[in-house]
Amino acid sequence: MIKTRKVLSVLLCTAATVYTLWYMHFGVPYKNSGALSKIGLEHRILFTIWGVLTYTALTMGIKLAFEKTEHKRLYIPFSVISGAGMLLTLANEFDYDKKLQYYLHCTGSLLFSAVTGICIFLLFFLLRKKDKVYLIFCVTAGVILIVDLICLLIFKETGLIEALPIFAGYVLLTVTNLRRDIVEIRI
């Protein structure tokens, strides 16, 4: 059963990565016009598919990875809040002329990205003493979140700035879920 879930998680992360890269071709990734939500104004159904696939892939990876911690269910409130954020993002247009929808969309997007990023960082923070690779992942996740926030404040939103932490999440969670942890045997 666990092996099946691992395979499903890897397949979801792979599909989400490929789909995100393909979806990003509708805009210029390093410009504001390449922001995932901006692309979604013209390609609403594709944006919805991207959102559902991204949320599902990250949540499945997070759920499996949290099974390696002593706090196996700690991810649940984060996933609920993140899911609510993604629902707000997908249900409301990123159109400044529709002010309420615009603000709800932005609120949802921020909730999804911030809460998911914090959850992944927390996961590796909890695992950091278990193995050095998790300490490295913890620092990596923290640095990516901080650098991404700084880039977002300086350059505004672009597809690359939005996608970097998502891709990092896919990679870090996939590696974590495929790793075998060393089991200490005491005699």
Each model region followed by its residue ranges:
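Membrane-interfacial loop-to-transmembrane alpha-helix junctions, especially the N-terminal start
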Residues: 5-13, 69-81, 130-141
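Alpha-helical transmembrane segments of multi-pass membrane proteins
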Residues: 13-30
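Aromatic-anchored segments of alpha-helical transmembrane domains
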Residues: 17-22, 81-91, 142-153
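Juxtamembrane "helix-exit" motif on the non-cytosolic side of transmembrane helices
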Residues: 24-28, 65-66, 91-99, 126, ...
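Membrane-interface interhelical loops and short amphipathic "cap" helices
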Residues: 28-42, 97-100
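Interfacial helix-start motif at the membrane-water boundary
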Residues: 37-56
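Membrane-proximal helix-loop-helix units in multi-pass membrane proteins
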Residues: 82-133
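Terminal transmembrane helical module of multi-pass membrane proteins
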Residues: 125-187
